[in-house]
C-alpha cells in the first residue's frame, strides 16, 4: 500500500491497513524528510528505490535500467493537481517535469490535454497543471468515468490520446455548468444566512441540498471558502443515500483535526472521515447533518480568533516600472509556484483612467502607473472602484495576433 494521507485515528489509536508493506511518509516512524509528497510522488520514490534494489541484485545495470525520468511529466502534473504543499522537494519534482514538457518530452496524453486546453506546452507552467490539465482529468471522475483520465495519461497512441482529451474537455464543460448552478444556489443560501446575522458569516459553514452533485462539492466548498474566508463543508447525497461532504479550510484551522475532535464529541455522527489540514472529506447519515453543522461551528468558534478569521494578503511590495514587461512575466512563469509557495503579488498606487464590466462579472480597468496607462482585470469583481487606489496584483501576458501585452491581474484594492 502506498499513501500520503495522515493515518486514520480510532479511539486515539492510529489504524493502518492490513498489508505486508506500507509506504507512507506520514505514518509513524517514517524518517523520510519530505512529508508533503503527493501520492504520485510517493510512488515515484518507491520506483526509484525498487530500481536501486534490482540493480543491486544484478537484474540490470546502470546502462540497462529503466529511465524513470520519463515519468516526471506525470509526477509534476499529479503533484500540482493534488494541491499539496510545494516544499523544496516537490518544487524540484515539478521543475524537472516542466523542463521535460517544455522540451517536448511528455506522454501523448499530456500533450493532448495541453492541446485540448489551448495551452502551449513550450511555455508550460505549474498553472497549467492546476487550472487547465488537472480539472479536465478530474472532471471525468466527478461526472463520468475516472478511467477516461487514466487511459488518456497512459496511452502511447497520440490519436487515442487526442480523442480522450476531447472527451475530457467536453465533460469538464459539463462540470462547469453543474458547478455554476450549485455555486449560485450556495451563494444565495450564504447571502440569506448572512442577512440574518447582520452580514457576518458564522465561524464555519456547512451546507447540504438534495439537488447537489457529489462530484463537485469540493469545488463549491473551495469557492465559498474563498468568498467568506471560513472553513467550509458542502454535502451531497451519494448513491448509497449517505451524505458525502467535502471541506476546505483556511490557514490556522486544521480540518482533519477538527473532524477528529468532532468525532470524539459526537461519535454517532461521522461514519468515515479523513484528509489534511486544508482539505478533508467525511460521510454521515442525513439525520445527523444538523448535529454536524452545530458541532463544526462549535469547534471553529473555539479554535479561530479574530486574527485568523481576517483575510490577510501578503505582498512583495511595489514593482519597479522598469520590470513591467513581458520578460519579467516570462521569467516569473518559468518558476514553480503553487500551494504554500505563491507567485509574487505587487502593490502600487494607481490612477483609474477608465473602468467597465466584461462578461457581466469582471471589471476591466485602464490605470495610470509609472506615467503610462496600463491594462488591468479584476476577475469576479463587478463593483466600480475609486479614481485612485492601491492595487494588489499579479502580472500576466495577454497574447493576441502574435503581440504580447502585459496586464495586471488584480487580487485586491484599497
Regions found by a protein language model. Give the residues of each.
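Hydrophobic, small-residue-rich alpha-helical packing segments that form membrane-like cores
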Residues: 1-42, 52, 63, 67-70
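Hydrophobic helix-and-loop "lid/oligomerization" segment in the mid-to-C-terminal part
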Residues: 18, 52-288, 318, 357-361
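Beta-strand/loop nucleic-acid-binding surfaces
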Residues: 259, 368-384
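Short amphipathic alpha-helices in soluble, non-transmembrane regions
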Residues: 259-262, 293-300
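OB-fold and OB-like beta-barrel modules that bind single-stranded nucleic acids
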Residues: 274, 332, 351, 386-399
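OB-fold single-stranded nucleic acid-binding module
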Residues: 288-292, 388-414
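Accessory interdomain/linker segments of ATP-dependent helicases and helicase-like nucleic-acid enzymes
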Residues: 313-374
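Single-stranded nucleic-acid-binding OB-fold domains
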Residues: 354-360, 379-383, 396-407
Amino acid at each position: 500500500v502506498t499513501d500520503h494521507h495522515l493515518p486514520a485515528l480510532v479511539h486515539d489509536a492510529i489504524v493502518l491497513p492490513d498489508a505486508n508493506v506500507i509506504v507512507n511518509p506520514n505514518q509513524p516512524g517514517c524518517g523520510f524528510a519530505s512529508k508533503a509528497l503527493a501520492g504520485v510522488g510517493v510512488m515515484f520514490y518507491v520506483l526509484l528505490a525498487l530500481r536501486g534494489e534490482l540493480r543491486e541484485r544484478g537484474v540490470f545495470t546502470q546502462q540497462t535500467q529503466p529511465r524513470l525520468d520519463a515519468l516526471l511529466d506525470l509526477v509534476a502534473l499529479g503533484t500540482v493537481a493534488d494541491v499539496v504543499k510545494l516544499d523544496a522537494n516537490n518544487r524540484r519534482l515539478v521543475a524537472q517535469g516542466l523542463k521535460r514538457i517544455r522540451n517536448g518530452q511528455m506522454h501523448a496524453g499530456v500533450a493532448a490535454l495541453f492541446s485540448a486546453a489551448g495551452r502551449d506546452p513550450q511555455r508550460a507552467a505549474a498553472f497549467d497543471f492546476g487550472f487547465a490539465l488537472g480539472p479536465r482529468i478530474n472532471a471525468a471522475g466527478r461526472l463520468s468515468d475516472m478511467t477516461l483520465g487514466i487511459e488518456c495519461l497512459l496511452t502511447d497512441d497520440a490519436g487515442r490520446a487526442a480523442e480522450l482529451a476531447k472527451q475530457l474537455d467536453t465533460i469538464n464543460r459539463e462540470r462547469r455548468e453543474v458547478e455554476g448552478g450549485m455555486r449560485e444556489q450556495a451563494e444565495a443560501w450564504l447571502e440569506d444566512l448572512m442577512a440574518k446575522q447582520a452580514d457576518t458569516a458564522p465561524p464555519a459553514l456547512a451546507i447540504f441540498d438534495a439537488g447537489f452533485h457529489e462530484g463537485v462539492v469540493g469545488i463549491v466548498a473551495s469557492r465559498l471558502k474563498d468568498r467568506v474566508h471560513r472553513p467550509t463543508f458542502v454535502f451531497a447525497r451519494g448513491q448509497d443515500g449517505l451524505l458525502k461532504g467535502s471541506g476546505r479550510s483556511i490557514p490556522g484551522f486544521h480540518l482533519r483535526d477538527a473532524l477528529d475532535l468532532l468525532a470524539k464529541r459526537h461519535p454517532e455522527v461521522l461514519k468515515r472521515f479523513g484528509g489534511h489540514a486544508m482539505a478533508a472529506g467525511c460521510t454521515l447519515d442525513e439525520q445527523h447533518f444538523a448535529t454536524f453543522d452545530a458541532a463544526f461551528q462549535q469547534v471553529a468558534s473555539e479554535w479561530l480568533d479574530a486574527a485568523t478569521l481576517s483575510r490577510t494578503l501578503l505582498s512583495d511590495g511595489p514593482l519597479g516600472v522598469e520590470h513591467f514587461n513581458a520578460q519579467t512575466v516570462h521569467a516569473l512563469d518559468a518558476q514553480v509556484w503553487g500551494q504554500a509557495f505563491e507567485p509574487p503579488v505587487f502593490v502600487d498606487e494607481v490612477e483609474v483612467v477608465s473602468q467597465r464590466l466584461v462578461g457581466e462579472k469582471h471589471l476591466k480597468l485602464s490605470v495610470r502607473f509609472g506615467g503610462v496607462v496600463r491594462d488591468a482585470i479584476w476577475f469576479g469583481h463587478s463593483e466600480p472602484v475609486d479614481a485612485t487606489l492601491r492595487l494588489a496584483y499579479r502580472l500576466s501576458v495577454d497574447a493576441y495576433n502574435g503581440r504580447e501585452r502585459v496586464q495586471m491581474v488584480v487580487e485586491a484594492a484599497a
